Amino acid sequence: MVAGAFRVLYDAKTIMTTPHQKRDMRPRGEKKEAVFHDGIERVTLSFYRYVKIENPERFCNELCERFTILGCLGRIYIAKEGINAQMNVPKINWDQFDAFIKTKPELVGVPYKLAVEEKNAPSFYKLIVKVKKKIVADGLSDESFDVTNTGAYLSAREFNDYVNDPDAVVVDMRNAYESEIGHFENAVTPQVDTFREELKVAPELLKIHKNKKIALYCTGGIRCEKASAWLKHNGFQNVRHLKGGIIDYKHQVARENLENKFKGKNFVFDERMSESIGEEIISYCHLCSNTKSDTHYHCKNLACHVLFLGCDTCIEKKKGYCSYKCVTFDRLPKQVKKLFTRNSHKNKPEQFKKHRLMGKR
């Protein structure tokens, strides 16, 4: 498909709602089908930068217009503190995309983290460019906190040295459901569901290691960079973080023929759900707790929609549901189920108020 066709396809389908948010308003199923069958080869990437953006709304509009024309899909969050982008770009339009990024002073030289692996299904099937208060939700309200006062970067080679050093502490700054399917050897993996929660507990959790060397890591670098600044703000002196996160670590290991210290898969927030970093399966099915599995599913009961790990046997036995309660609930009349939609959280039965199941570690 030629570049001009992207303008027709995507301009016609993207509805500009407000200066804060531009979204494709077609039904979810229609969007997924259209992208899945369009035959366009895409490059999945992520990038972020903590940089002062004077007018996030205008910046949002400019990016949305250009990304729409180029046929880009994904989630791009913009705030006064910077930009956080997870997206894919039609390969045929990559040079135009890269040239556009370089026209933005705020983005010149921003490093791209290219996906470790592309899968059969596209990583994204819609484009969202949105203005937010923060590019990654942190729950912090301390006006004296300087997000730019970060720890130094660690290369993959240096990070491996930290992993091997008994006097160093390696900390996973991702959520528990992410580290469950993959993490670095000997890493501290806090049992939290959100980055906001982890920032809250990290200073207390790590205070016994305050005088040690601390190395932080996350998916692509955005969370551990902010976390390094937060720990320094709380009196930690020797804090560093993995440059480019797990994604770039994998690329560095391959380029430099280094030992891979990451075990399992890297959870990603797109349609792929994960990328293979190590060869091991380290997690277990949440339904039986006996069979190893690193494949995530969402419960077919939309009132639940919990994220869980399932083995082939349990998925077949429960038909894609996380429990027999959900199987039973989903057989209720449609009028009854409407009372318990995902958007009516306070009305849900107690068993549907959880976000995800945590299984055997």
Where are these regions (language model features)?
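Substrate-contacting helices/loops that form the catalytic groove of nucleic-acid
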Residues: 219
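Rhodanese-like catalytic fold shared by cysteine-dependent sulfurtransferases
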Residues: 12, 17-152, 165, 175-213, ...
